[in-house]
Amino acid sequence: MNRRSIALLGSLLLAPVARATPDAAESRETRATMGEIFRAVAELLPPSLDAKRFADPAHHDAILAALTKLSTGGAKLEAHGRERDAGFGFLSRSLARDTEEIRRRYAEGQTEEARFLFHEVTQDCVACHSRLPSPRDASLGRRLMLEEQVAALPLDERARLEIATRQFERAETTFEALLASPEYRASDLDLDGALDEYLEVCLRVRRDFERPARALERFAARADVSPRLRARVQHWILSLREIAARKRAATPLAEAQELLAVAQDRTRFPDERDALVYDLAASGELHRFADATPAGPEAALAYFRLGEIESRVGRSFWLSQTEAYFETAIRMAPGEPFAPQALARLQEFLVSGYTGSGGRQVPADVQTRLAELRGLVERARPAAPPPPTPARQVQPPAAR
């Protein structure tokens, strides 16, 4: 089974929305939509775990009907996301696009492609649920975790399922078992992102610094940890304890700026990956600030900083939020000093995604969007003052 089990997707949508919106009715509608999506996924889960059953014509009509419900629910969630913070909006748009793509491919007979995409779309879920603190775990998720099929998942898949179902304390415990397991090589855990995901849960969601420091000390003591990885983990352990001991700034945005100043200090962190803990801690503060501040120059600055961080720490080939953060910063405040920087970073990010074309193969719709954003920034730029009028020179009278 794919490392991102389909069960992740089904459970993601059990969770309440990350922040209560001002309109309680809208919040209820969002939860109802998530329930619709979950029920569709519950129908799809059993056949999706068996490639032959998923492709069996005897099950075609039932699977297509469930995929249609899933796609419809994704479209509804996208509509709700327009009224939410930019991060939720981006992820709900991504979910809507992906679920419709799955339905279309299955309807066209591309059953294995649809099944693969169904597995991969879980990144929408994990990305959304690991942004903000959670006051409690979700009861529906707890019940799902008791399923025999779920309990038998490998540790890495189970940990990601627990994130998607908002079982964050369980996810911490499962990740710690994963980091200690001799069945997984230390280098693979690093390359596969398990260390990063564990720290995301601890810092962004649980806001816990000492527990991961102890877990990383145990991981660093493993015999198969390379000297370079051990040195990196030691950087992370020191950073965790420094942040836990420091005096917080007055606001989340100010706190994030201070943490980022350390993360970007290349005299201390010549390799930017060594600064992961400071980056993740700063991103947690920025998410909290953006969640509470839906608009304005400071919110735009928060999204610009999130784009910078995501460009350094993002791992997903399937779902990169870098583009969404930079674009949100530009649209929200095109006249701010950081907007041209956001535009330059966005252009670099998008063009590099289409190499080795050297940018010549950037799709027309992407070029159109970049041109629109460039126009926003240029129109918002203060007009240059006119050059001073030269003083009129008085000619001396002609000599007689």
Name each model-derived stretch.
Residues 26-33, 47, 87-91, 98, ...:
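Acidic, polar-rich low-complexity tracts and alpha-helical solenoid repeat scaffolds
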Residues 37-40, 44-81, 175, 274-285:
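Alpha-helical segments in soluble extracytoplasmic regions
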